[in-house]
Amino acid sequence: MNLVVGMTWDGVNDSPALRRADVGFAMGSGTEAARDAGDIVILDDNFRSIKDAILYGRTIYNNILKFCRFQLVINIAAVVVSAFAPFFGIMEPLRVTHLLFINLVMDSLGAIMLGNEPAHESYMHEKPRRRDASIISPAMAAQILWMGTWLVLLSFAFLTQPIFAACFAGQAEQYTAYFLLFVLASLMNGFNVRSSGFGIFRDLGANPGFLRVWGGIVLIMAAIINAPLLPNEIGAWIGAMFSCTPIHPGGWVLAFLLAATMLPVDLLRKALVRALR
């Protein structure tokens, strides 16, 4: 079956099984032969310790998957938009510095944001995974493609439709707003990947770093966009480096509202998946 097998007990006759298992859990009060054969010694002789170890191992694994879903949506959308934008007469909607910010800042802070998600007892009801099972499951791939496609469609609609262009004073302001929209949409998707169900806001208090990082990235974006307003050369340098110009409050509201569509779109996908089961 190619599954990872754990074995536990404390007797001399259990030593061969403890040794052959992928992970042998020997009881602390067991025989010396059993303790020598085991990989891990349970000092409190409590089966709950084994259960907790499995739970937190699965939590780490699921948090890695959450980050992968979060980051792959960003990368797919950024690549597709950058590659196909010239065919629509759009030159560099995401500058090199924008892509560096998205990959460096969003990568590192996104790992902190999702890496500390709390353990859920539901993880213990998951089926065992084969050794050769792909990290990206069909369900995970479907979510990545669904949300990546929506972010791409949202991007091209924002960049090509006159109704959005009319909201800004010029192309520079519109492209700055698009950079903001892309980052905010990615952050909104961070809520989506927290849960495979509908409880995307559940247990936010158990991971205070999530909202801190979320708010921190928004503040960093505000600092970058409004840097040219500073009465010194540093502000002008930051604005030139990121090709950003200050946008009016209405532009911020529009970017937030469009980015927030990431939430109902993924909830719709989850509802369809549940209905088709």
Regions found by a protein language model. Name each.
Residues 178-181, 212-217, 255:
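Hydrophobic mid-bilayer segments of alpha-helices in multi-pass membrane transport proteins
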Residues 1-13, 19-22, 64, 86, ...:
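Cytosolic catalytic headpiece
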Residues 202-211:
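Cytoplasmic-side transmembrane-helix entry/capping segments in multi-pass membrane proteins
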Residues 186-190, 225, 262-270:
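Alpha-helical transmembrane segments
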Residues 1-6, 21, 28-198:
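Membrane-embedded transport module
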Residues 15-16, 32:
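Alpha-helical segments flanking ligand/cofactor-binding loops in enzyme cores
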